Amino acid sequence: MWLTRKRKAEARDELIKILDLTKTLVDRSEESCFDGMSPAEISMDLSIAIDALRAGDSFDSEQLKVHFAPTGILQEVAMMSGWADEYLRISELFDELIAAGA
């Protein structure tokens, strides 16, 4: 059980790093005419999740899954702002961490 908690804590720490990186990229991004949300709104959602994770609280993983989904809002912003390849790497790590119970 201790090991499971340790792994979960490590996964949460990695998820925080991934979300921080994503937030940094989003903060430098341009708005897409195809998105329903601005980069500032996406950044706010990421900040809320990061703060919750750091506090050890629950967060809206379903909302983040929608943001990170293929052809979702983050991919659109990434494509419009020149970080599509990095988005693919980030989203793969995000999916792995969420599946691990982060």
Question: Residue spans of the language-model regions?
Answer:
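Short terminal alpha-helical segments
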Residues: 1-39, 94-101
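Short, Lys/Arg-enriched charge-dense amphipathic segments
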Residues: 3-11, 46, 51-62, 79-90
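Generic structural signal for well-ordered, non-transmembrane alpha-helical segments
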Residues: 13-16, 20, 40, 44-47, ...
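Amphipathic alpha-helical interaction modules
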Residues: 23-72
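Amphipathic alpha-helical binding modules
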Residues: 63-102
